[in-house]
């Protein structure tokens, strides 16, 4: 989360058109495996990824115009992996859906080719959905399910083992575990067929409260629906004690990805910091073996900020 949240802009922007077909399907099978099986690396640098979100001011894409700074050099998402490898020496990336210049098959093929040619891999695709899983209108819930399935197909095409699905709000309706679980049960079943993990993140502190997420995951009861613990998001509205309990609950249900950050800028430019060493300790105690994606949201420019997160992560994974 940031001072001006991406949700507010993306809700008013046109949704990237999802192509009717996808290319290069490599995951999944004729029958869904009972649970995901990924061979996670153990070397610290190989467990790290870089998210495209902190670099939004550089990225050229139709749905990123609100964040693009024309005074800065532009970058297509196809080149993001090469930048990460060259600048940070890391080989895993996490491209946000709004940073895709297109979702047509030809562009997806170019994105995957450019990323892999640079020696990088896509390990998660965060998706900011516009319709709510818990909307009281069944038609809107159906739209959220359909959009999720399309992005699972896209992740499959790109060779990404997972997506992060945003739980969008619904007018004045409070988050509802039963309706959310009903929607996500369908999505998790589809994700299993494609061998793609669907993750839920404690991002929006109203619609994505960490304990609400845990309740939903437990109600769905599908191993392809997992938690994505973000180190600092809950600190925007809560204290360190709450964050510790939230991380403990989330990491029990995490599988393949977590967002590492040490601070976040909130309303009025106020900087919230988090005990990130405690977060790493909680992850280790939970037996978490997945990736940590660097998502710089502190003050200053993202290159130095991301390097700071990398250095902090290396010290904690040593």
Whereabouts are the PLM-identified features?
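N-terminal pre-domain/capping segments
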Residues: 2-157, 175, 192, 222, ...
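Acidic/histidine-rich catalytic cores of soluble enzymes
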Residues: 62, 92-93, 181-282
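Residues at the N-termini of beta-strands
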Residues: 92, 162, 257, 290-291
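Structured beta->alpha junctions
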Residues: 99-100, 169, 202-204, 239, ...
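A short helix->loop->beta-strand "cap" motif at the edges of active sites that frequently abuts
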Residues: 120, 196, 286-290
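Active-site groove signature of glycoside hydrolases
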Residues: 155-174, 196-203
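Active-site cleft segment of glycoside hydrolase catalytic domains centered on the general acid/base Glu
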Residues: 170-184
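Short acidic/histidine-rich active-site segments
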Residues: 293-297
């Amino acid at each position: 989360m940031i001072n001006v949240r991406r949700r507010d802009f993306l809700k008013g922007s046109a949704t990237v058109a999802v192509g009717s077909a996808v290319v290069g399907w490599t995951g999944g099978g004729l029958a869904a495996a009972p649970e995901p099986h990924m061979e996670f690396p153990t070397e610290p640098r190989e467990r790290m990824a870089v998210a495209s979100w902190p670099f939004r001011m550089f990225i050229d894409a139709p749905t990123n115009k609100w964040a693009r700074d024309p005074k800065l050099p532009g970058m297509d998402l196809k080149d993001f992996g090469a930048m990460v490898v060259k600048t940070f020496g890391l080989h895993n990336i996490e491209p946000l859906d709004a940073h895709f210049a297109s979702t047509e098959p030809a562009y997806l093929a170019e994105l995957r080719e450019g990323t892999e040619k640079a020696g990088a891999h896509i390990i998660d695709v965060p998706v900011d959905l516009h319709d709510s899983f818990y909307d009281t209108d069944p038609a809107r819930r159906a739209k959220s399910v359909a959009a999720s399935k399309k992005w699972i197909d896209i992740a499959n095409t790109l060779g990404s083992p997972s997506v992060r699905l945003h739980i969008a709000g619904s007018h004045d309706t409070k988050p509802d575990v039963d309706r959310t679980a009903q929607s996500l049960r369908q999505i998790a079943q589809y994700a299993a067929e494609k061998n793609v993990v669907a993750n839920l993140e404690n991002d929006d502190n109203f619609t994505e409260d960490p304990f609400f997420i845990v309740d939903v995951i437990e109600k769905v009861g599908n191993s392809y629906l997992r938690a994505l613990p973000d180190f600092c998001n809950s600190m925007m509205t809560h204290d360190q004690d709450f964050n510790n309990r939230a991380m403990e609950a989330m990491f029990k249900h995490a599988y393949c990805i977590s967002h590492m950050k040490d601070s976040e800028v909130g309303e009025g430019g106020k900087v919230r910091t988090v005990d990130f060493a405690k977060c790493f300790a909680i992850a280790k105690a939970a037996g978490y073996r997945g990736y940590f994606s660097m998502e710089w949201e502190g003050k200053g420019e993202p290159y130095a900020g991301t390097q700071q997160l990398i250095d902090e992560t290396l010290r904690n994974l040593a």
